[in-house]
């Protein structure tokens, strides 16, 4: 397994959205395993394929209390098909938007449908942290970042900070 590079804002791939997975083959299985290795190496709780520069509708996550067992879940072609309950607002961070933590409103309960890594239909009724993580990762597949859900002020301050870093890096080369 390989730890993959995490794509960070403002990379275009993060805004492009993802295409459905057509074939579950050895190449996809390797991507899943590499994504898991990457997620754990970066202490993440979830990872979307677009975050490792793959334009596929694929997410992995692990919200278990025993993360050392690395019992991550895989959802291929995930779709939120139902939301229920009130909205909750939680502080979220993102590996692709480093150094930003912001309150994001999410549905408290969601139903997600997709397929597992063997291609079997999957229905997940999630609440709490699992619901938040699934919505966050599916947002990635739709080209939405937590930055897009942040307040306008926070969004503008973060964008300026990133542009300043890019300009400094450009000048150093």
UniProtKB/Swiss-Prot annotation:
The protein's enzyme class: hydrolase
Cofactor, free-text remark: Binds 1 Fe(2+) ion.
Location of the active site: 137
Catalytic activity of the protein: N-terminal N-formyl-L-methionyl-[peptide] + H2O = N-terminal L-methionyl-[peptide] + formate
Record keyword Hydrolase present: yes
GO biological process: co-translational protein modification; translation
Functional note: Removes the formyl group from the N-terminal Met of newly synthesized proteins. Requires at least a dipeptide for an efficient rate of reaction. N-terminal L-methionine is a prerequisite for activity but the enzyme has broad specificity at other positions.
Protein name: Peptide deformylase
Organism, scientific name: Desulfosudis oleivorans (strain DSM 6200 / JCM 39069 / Hxd3) (Desulfococcus oleovorans)
Source lineage: Bacteria, Pseudomonadati, Thermodesulfobacteriota, Desulfobacteria, Desulfobacterales
Recorded name of the encoding gene: def
């Amino acid at each position: 397994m390989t730890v993959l590079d995490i794509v960070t804002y403002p990379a275009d791939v993060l805004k492009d959205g993802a295409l459905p997975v057509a074939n579950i083959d050895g190449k996809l299985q390797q991507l899943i395993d590499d994504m898991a290795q990457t997620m754990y190496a970066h202490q993440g709780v979830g990872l979307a394929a677009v975050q490792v520069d793959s334009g596929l509708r694929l997410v992995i996550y692990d919200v278990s209390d025993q993360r050392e067992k690395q019992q991550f879940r895989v959802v291929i072609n995930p779709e939120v098909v139902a939301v229920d309950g009130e909205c909750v607002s939680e502080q979220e961070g993102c590996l692709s938007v480093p150094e930003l933590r912001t309150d994001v409103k999410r549905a408290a309960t969601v139903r997600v449908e997709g397929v597992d890594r063997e291609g079997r239909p999957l229905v997940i009724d999630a609440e709490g942290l699992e619901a938040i993580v699934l919505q966050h990762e599916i947002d990635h597949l739709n080209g939405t970042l937590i930055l897009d859900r942040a307040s306008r002020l926070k969004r503008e301050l973060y964008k300026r900070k990133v542009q300043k870093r890019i300009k400094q890096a450009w000048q150093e080369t």
